[in-house]
A protein has these predicted regions:
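Short, membrane-interfacial amphipathic segments enriched in basic
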Residues: 1-11, 282, 383-392
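Extracytoplasmic/periplasmic domains immediately adjacent to an N-terminal transmembrane anchor
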Residues: 1-188, 240-251, 255, 261-272, ...
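Cytosol-facing boundaries of transmembrane alpha helices in integral membrane proteins
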Residues: 16, 179, 185-192, 196, ...
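Hydrophobic alpha-helical segments typical of transmembrane helices
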Residues: 63-67, 138, 207, 219, ...
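Short loop/turn hinge sites at secondary-structure boundaries
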Residues: 96, 114-116, 218, 244, ...
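Transmembrane alpha-helical segments that form the functional core of multipass membrane systems
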Residues: 190-248, 264-349, 353-368
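Membrane-spanning alpha-helical segments of multipass transporters and channels
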Residues: 301, 305-448
Length: 448
């Protein structure tokens, strides 16, 4: 009963604060919702196509015109402009009007007809890795198609049948089979993994600010006294401020009235802020755990809903096993809970909301880069691997990709779910211990 009371009173305490502070409420409700929908809308075009390139045609021959038509027909690229000089083309690349330049050299057609090598020059802005890779693939495909057609026509003129000419031109073929994400769906590849990463950041920020503002405003003791049932007033800090202002106004009116009000104000302060030593000596870890659970129940519930929305959006069009969906959702909810507790730990450990937010940003913001989604995990340095192995987002994304995109057996990812659950429990216990330490050191409250 005592723990239930602590949970309910702490939840009511936090609900009242959120109702009176729209920005904090927005961090729980509207900002994560807008983030999820915005990221999904940004990647609504699931495939990259029609990347603009420029062309310098120095040959002006029918064969060069054929190459230009092939380039324009490629789904990956589109010809945005024809340039007359390399200088003009360079300006186009620098201004990002085009991402690459195809140069058709002089005597292109003559060299082909005479059987001499006739290269196509591709200059690509490799600063944009994804763009350049797609453009290189598209131009190489066009060049291969045109080259095959020219060679097969030459062999047919020599009396070889078209079928034999095709085999003679390319006796070894590559049969490429994409096992996962065969359509190169960037919404499935990037958006579905970026959303959990951003929710991870927001949850850590909320975790830091929810307990951090109690330290900053020197209200941690009042909060604990309220959840423990020693005070029946919900808005303790507000009542204290009002009584202080009234005391100051009465002092200006009359010294006798002021003395009386000062005595009342002093007794009121004594009742509101009972001796801190008496509070800290009787701090119960179980009550703290229940109070912290109630304090964080609203962001936990909200982010469980956003996790459900993220999983629903990330679910591929083809069927996914219910067990895989459930395991992924549980993993994401555990990641959100762990993020809340980690944010609280960083703030409580430093006794400073500012330091807690700094640590939160330092750890959560770049965690996606170390998770092995955009850059291969096996290719990073050993030091980066050790750092990646300490980040909870790394393990969740392994679970996410394995279950939703690779359809791996559930047993492959169960260890990650168990690990996240254990880490969440440990983080919650550590938060309670650090809260007890903070209650025992009131002289360190008030740091920004």
């Amino acid at each position: 009963m005592r723990l239930t009371q602590a949970f309910v009173r702490s939840a009511a305490y936090e609900r009242r604060f959120l109702a009176k502070n729209p920005w904090d409420l927005a961090m729980v409700l509207w900002i994560p919702l807008a983030t999820v929908l915005l990221i999904w809308w940004i990647f609504s075009q699931t495939q990259i196509s029609d990347l603009p390139i420029g062309v310098i045609d120095q040959d002006q021959s029918p064969m060069a015109n054929t190459l230009v038509r092939y380039l324009e027909a490629s789904p990956d690229i589109t010809i945005a402009n024809f340039y007359n000089s390399p200088a003009a083309a360079k300006d186009g690349i620098l201004q990002r009007d085009v991402y690459a330049l195809v140069i058709i050299p002089e005597n292109f057609s003559r060299n082909i007809l005479s059987g001499k090598p006739s290269p196509i020059i591709l200059q690509v802005n490799a600063q944009y890795g994804t763009h350049s890779g797609i453009i290189q693939k598209g131009v190489q495909s066009v060049a291969g198609t045109l080259s095959a057609g020219v060679e097969i026509q030459r062999l047919v003129k020599q009396g070889i049948s078209p079928t034999q000419a095709a085999i003679a031109y390319s006796p070894i073929n590559i049969q490429r089979t994409s096992l996962f994400n065969a359509a190169t769906n960037y919404q499935q590849f990037l958006a579905s993994t970026v959303i959990p990463a951003l929710l991870h950041i927001l949850a850590m920020v909320i975790g830091a600010t929810t307990i951090g503002r109690e330290l900053r405003d020197k209200q941690l003791g009042r909060w604990y006294r309220f959840i423990e049932g020693r005070s029946s007033k919900l808005s303790l800090a507000t009542d204290d401020i009002v009584s202080t202002k009234n005391s100051a106004n009465n002092h200006l009116t009359s010294s006798s009235v002021s003395n009386s009000n000062n005595i009342k104000d002093q007794s009121s302060r004594t009742n509101l802020t009972a001796p801190i030593a008496a509070v800290t000596k009787s701090v119960s870890i179980s009550v703290l755990l229940a109070g912290l659970a109630g304090k964080y129940c609203w962001p936990a519930l909200a982010y469980s809903l956003w996790a459900l929305l993220a999983i629903w959006l990330a679910t591929p069009q083809y069927p996914t096993a219910p067990s895989s969906l459930l395991a992924t959702y549980i993993g994401l909810v555990l990641l959100m809970m762990l993020s809340l507790w980690l944010g609280a730990i960083f703030t409580l450990a430093s006794f400073s909301l500012r330091a807690g937010l700094s640590a939160t940003g330092f750890i959560s913001a770049p965690s996606y880069a170390f998770a092995g989604v955009t850059f291969p995990y096996i290719a990073i340095s050993d030091g980066a691997k050790h750092w990646s192995d300490m980040l909870p987002l790394t393990y969740y994304l392994k679970l996410h990709i394995a279950q939703l995109q690779m359809h791996a057996p559930l047993a492959v990812s169960l260890s990650i779910v168990y690990g996240l659950a254990l880490a969440t429990i440990i983080a919650m216990l550590l938060t309670a211990l650090l809260s007890k330490r903070a209650l025992a050191n009131p002289q360190r409250w008030g740091a920004r």
